[in-house]
């Protein structure tokens, strides 16, 4: 939310819009990433901790972004009837486009709403950018202003409840444009874990 309302061209990498997750790597044999295999062989030859290396690369490797797109519950997630270069993530039966496309509460629908909001008003493209509460380490917050239009974009980057110090904005009437929590009530004193929203101020 807080990235896509900034200047520049937003992009979505395949699978991001349905919340595809990292592949469950369990051994070096499950990796195709050449850089991972090369470093593994070097560390192993030097008698290093290959288990620690594998744990690191479960999260930090290129293969996580190379798994087949998960379209539906069919073989290979509907990506191909052939043999894909990399196996489909085993969770494809629960995380796929078909499961989400008609669900108004899905990640896919949220991305659609996010794109629609970005395209709905030039304030999100050309509006002046100003940081808000910039010394707050837990929140990333800013306003975009164009002519007489102004929006506030906030994202809580932590798993902790945080407070946003914007008294001059709280006094004004707000219209919630997008919110990743089911409640559209914004409490500036209690920004919930990973809460993100866009409001007109």
PLM region descriptions:
Residues 19-20, 159:
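Short, glycine/acidic-enriched loop or turn micro-motifs at the edges of active sites
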Residues 9-12, 25-28, 33-201:
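Carbohydrate-interacting/catalytic domains
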Residues 7-19:
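Substrate-binding cleft of secreted/luminal carbohydrate-active enzymes
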């Amino acid at each position: 939310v807080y990235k896509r309302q900034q200047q520049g061209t937003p992009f979505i990498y395949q699978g991001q819009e349905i919340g595809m997750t990292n592949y469950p790597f369990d051994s070096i044999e499950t990796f195709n990433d050449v850089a991972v295999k090369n470093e593994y062989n070097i560390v192993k030859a030097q008698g290093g901790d290959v288990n620690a290396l594998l744990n690191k690369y479960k999260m930090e490797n290129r293969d996580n972004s190379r798994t087949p797109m998960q379209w539906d519950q069919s073989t290979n997630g509907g990506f191909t009837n052939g043999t894909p270069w990399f196996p489909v993530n085993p969770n494809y039966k629960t995380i796929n486009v078909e499961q989400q496309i008609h669900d108004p509460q899905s990640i896919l629908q949220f991305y659609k709403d996010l794109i629609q909001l970005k395209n709905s008003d030039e304030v999100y493209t050309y509006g002046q950018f100003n940081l808000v509460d910039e010394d707050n380490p837990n929140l990333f917050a800013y306003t975009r202003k164009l002519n007489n239009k102004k929006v506030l974009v906030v994202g809580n980057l932590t798993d902790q409840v945080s407070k946003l110090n914007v008294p001059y904005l709280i006094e004004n009437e707000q219209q919630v444009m997008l919110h990743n929590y089911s409640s559209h009530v914004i409490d500036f004193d209690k920004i919930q874990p990973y809460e993100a929203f866009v409001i007109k101020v």
